[in-house]
A protein has these predicted regions:
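Helix-to-loop junction immediately C-terminal to a conserved catalytic motif
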Residues: 64
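Hydrophobic anchor residue at the start of the ABC signature
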Residues: 145
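Conserved ABC ATPase "signature" region
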Residues: 103, 112-127
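Catalytic Walker B motif of ABC-type/P-loop ATPase nucleotide-binding domains
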Residues: 156-160, 165
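The feature captures the beta-strand-to-loop junction immediately N-terminal to the Walker
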Residues: 49-51
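Q-loop/switch helix immediately C-terminal to the Walker
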Residues: 89, 94-108
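Conserved ABC ATPase signature
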Residues: 131-138
Length: 166
């Protein structure tokens, strides 16, 4: 099987306020991920399990290039195009429809996806002309999944994808 993602010694530390300093803006290294080695091959299904604060979301965000981690090339074009990311929560708001939102995102990603088919795939066919403000939390999760699927990514990273699903 083909390797689609490889990490070697990847680390990231969140910056937190340093209350021991007399400077109110001072920051220090907080929790994070340390020296992660990971290889994901095509067709692999991988789950991250651990207690709150273990670094699962941090690792997922690092994989997607949202953090500038040590030992990881965030600038890779592959990362932008070939990874679909579904965050734990997205605040879908606004006076546009589900269909308009997905069409706009597809345009930004320079992808000519069949939005109607994508809406059908994630179970939002009956909601395609509804405004984002009127969607339930479960419908918003489905919309996030649809966004992650735009571009037919080779790697799909989902952070608590079933949270709030109807």
């Amino acid at each position: 099987m083909e390797t689609i993602l490889s990490l070697s010694g990847v680390s990231w530390r969140h910056k937190v306020r340093d209350f021991s300093s007399w400077k109110p803006w001072a920051k220090r290294d907080g929790a994070g991920i340390y020296s992660v080695d990971l290889e994901i091959k095509s067709g692999t299904i991988l789950g991250l399990i651990g207690p709150n604060g273990a670094g699962k979301t941090t690792l997922m965000r690092a994989i997607c290039g949202l953090y500038d981690c040590e030992g990881f090339d965030k600038s890779s074009e592959t990362r932008r195009v070939e990874i679909g990311y579904m965050p734990e929560q997205v605040r879908w708001e606004g006076r546009i429809t589900v269909k308009q939102a997905l069409s706009s995102i597809a345009m930004m990603r320079e992808d000519s996806v069949d939005v109607g088919n994508l809406i059908q795939t994630v179970g939002l066919a009956s909601k395609s002309d509804q405004m984002l403000d009127s969607l339930s939390q479960g419908m918003r999760q489905r919309l996030s999944l649809a966004c992650a699927l735009i571009g037919k990514p080779r790697l799909l990273v989902m952070d608590e994808p079933l949270n709030g699903l109807d």
